[in-house]
UniProtKB/Swiss-Prot annotation:
This is Altered inheritance of mitochondria protein 24, mitochondrial. Keywords: Mitochondrion, Transit peptide. GO terms for biological process: inner mitochondrial membrane organization. Gene3D superfamilies: Mitochondrial biogenesis AIM24 (3.60.160.10). It is found in: Mitochondrion. Belongs to the AIM24 family. GO terms for cellular component: mitochondrial inner membrane. Residues 1-30 form a transit peptide.
Amino acid sequence: MSLNQYIRPVRTKLSHISFIRNISITQSSINTTIKNDESISKTTTIPENIQQAKELAGYRALEIPEFKTLGSAEGTTATATGSSSILSINVPPSVPVYIRRGSLLSIYGIQEISSIDSVRSQLQFPNFWKRLIYGGYVSGYQKLISTTPFSLLISSKSRSSGSGSGSGFEKSFVNLVLDGTTDWAILDKSALQVYTGNSLSITMHKLPKFISKKLSRSLKKDKKSKTNTNKLETGLFSWKKLGYTLLSGRGKVGLVGNGSSSGYGSSIYNINLNQNEEILINKNNLLGITVNGPYDLQNCIVKYEFPIINNANPTNTNTNINIKEPVTIVKPKLIQPTTWNLIVLKLKNFNNGFKKIFQIINKYTLGLKTTSYNYLAGNQDFIKVIGPRNLLLQSNTNKSHRGFYNIIPRNKPQAKVWPTNQTTTKVDESSSFSTPKDYLNYVTIEPGKGAVFKSTLDFSETVESIENKNKNKNK
């Protein structure tokens, strides 16, 4: 027998063999119970069920912090439409954020990655001595940093004392992005609310009292003023307020000003001045201005006083025009030293001295008149800003709020009346505290009189009298 004869029957047997593997899968009821438990103890709803409320979401893929004012369309710009009383900040990992002490509302957006313990807090007092000397205040800032992204809600008002957080103040946020090209001089001591940036520099400097020589030369060239422009004041310096805050470098800053986009219709506004463009502003409303370094503030601001119109010459209202008068040169003459000539010479010298004294008195009297007029008219705090500059104006000031709330009369407590044995006269309360009554007016046509207008409390008597007249006529 050959080999094929032995292999052939083996192949036929192997072709009829089949392998069967039985696997049993048991499904537990854990998922169904969890699903049922979630449906029973559900604590969230769909976003469509919450209307007219902006949803806050934490952002994960960020390299730099994101500032956004809530309730505005353009929350990242320094415009009036971006004013709001709450600021939302999305912070990337390992980036510190400094917020004013007592202004933190909420920390959110971290529950998906880690716990709240990842956020570290530290209290700092930057520029302690300079702020105490130049401004007479000390501001504490809370440093927040985390290894994971998180989000913050910041209020424009601070619960800490000394930050202008009274009940009469309405404050709004405005955001600034510093790219290193321009610096900002912040004149309000309570304006800096939140800031971030590793290369951001915040320093305190003294307010300049007088203008610079550069601005003095430009004023002499353009206006040809009679006054000595070397001693013109900037109008910013006062013993109550000696310094300002300078923001330089790169970073983001959240400022607050006295003004809100709701309520009384007030807000914070941005004004752009072109080259050699001028504007008059009340210095108490000036929140911030762009500068080029710490010594540039004296190159763009000068104190302004409204001139008084002279009644003797009402047509000449511009006091800055220099009218050149012809100068006559008188050659000295030799006189004989007689008694009469000496008397005349003394009289001339006395007359010249009296004229100089009168000119000095007139000069200071006119200055006192101008200062008094501007003070009484409320224009004593005006300054003139020369462009090119960017300005931030706040519609309200701390002084205006204090004045407004002082005007409102307070309810005086009523005097207590104690019973006595003396006889008292009864006062008719209806005469002093009479309640208004409603009267009904009607018109009657009487012969010989025409239309007669009358008023009554009730038409019943009038209707009866008219019916009686009709009955008498019918009879």
